[in-house]
């Protein structure tokens, strides 16, 4: 992983160094590292394990959580609990970052319970003498560390972060400067990641000894890229710090941005400039706008409509793929973004000092596209036109690396594999993916529903944790045109008492309005699948086989009826609140269905029950026929304007993917693409007749 991790927000000039690779690593199962000041003395070669943090047995509460999710018809593995470790010492070893210790790719491949982890390595100051003189900063950047990270440099605390699925950065400059002329600096990281805390957002990471049903091997510690970067002291901030580029005004052609800066010194004056080009043709450049005295934020608007002269300069390759008279590609000189024509504007943001010198420059992209779900006719629109979202459930796991993509290209490959099957997007399920995924979704034309890793028990601690991390997740990907819907919660996970618990309902309402306050341009799916509290979309999950699903999807009453024993909308609580109902005309979407595996061969070890799916096909041809009937049943019922097929690829024991775990075809992709394309056409035929 030697390519720059954030091509969606790249400085010019770019000065960085990857910290991926070999680190010293030590399990601290007795949690003695802080008391013994490992951050000051360096990691010991060995440490005694005087007490075990592995809890034998399982709580009835955690078992009931799992059983409620998977349903009473699915038997759980008996005694699926971690055994207490007999190990009396842990030795310092090497780990290959960014792969987690549970994975083979890390070089450790340990599936036991280790809740406290220590990482250490030497780093050097990348800054040149001139950069130091100019006051440039040395920043440590972490893609994601699950779950709580504390960071020291040369034994001095420099920062920390809580939240396992979102990036953070630490300014290491002062600690490096304090070390004087030293050329090597000791970077130490302590990570705490509970194996059992069900109020901690964890997504599909299981708390049992063996992954089962829809749950998988956990990923503890550093699981995305780590790198050093040299940045100007005063600089342009990314979306995580508040820079937002709104690109939904396809009629006015206005790009509306809020540019945030960091590192502004008191009394200093700065100006911000935004420039746009398309396919190498300069389109527009804003006036230089002064940062107000009272804030580090400035609004910059830009008209990105191409004039006739600018359009005449476009390369023929662009015009052949996206003719100017095609209103799905262009709107009165505005280049439109869609899965079929993912046209992107190149943007450059510049920061000037008071002497009109460029002190920072960042390159990024955007796509002009609008989303509408409010017409009241049951349709979801992209760029003013009804659009059918044919999505897959994409959970982002790989055989030897788990939640970490094995290579940067793996993220691009998954998008290409989905499109090969005739799909135009995904629900990125129970995971905030590496930002490189969204970069490729923008470039390749792939719709994405933004989601977060849920927890499984409700508490005030959970509310505080989730609000903070969900906010960071939304801000991380808010500038990507490929992201079209927000889904904070899935299937009431963590909200087991919505039927009569006002506190749980109020938190889902809070998440809805919190998300709206961050971004009112995208649809919000409050609680995907059932028990909606307040939502823009009526989404339901139904893993019935073909005939039963056809019956359900032909009736709005059956669609909005109970699913998996849950009400589709929360009922009234007498004397307390009215509950919720389907809003007539709101888009209806089947956001989980399918999940069909192929009947496994008998195994001598008796583990055939580990090959798991919701329903079972006899062979690949039977699987294609089942998918055809499920897809047609969803669409031809006349109510659904989107589906999410479960799932893109097999994961461990859940072998109901369109591809195997290592991304090999399980069935003929040309047949699947043809049947999906044909079924979607029936949707457009019906809409066009209306």
Q: What residue ranges belong to the model's regions?
A:
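Short, solvent-exposed loop/turn and secondary-structure capping segments
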Residues: 35-37, 151-154, 162-163, 198-202, ...
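Contiguous beta-strand segments within globular domains
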Residues: 245-261
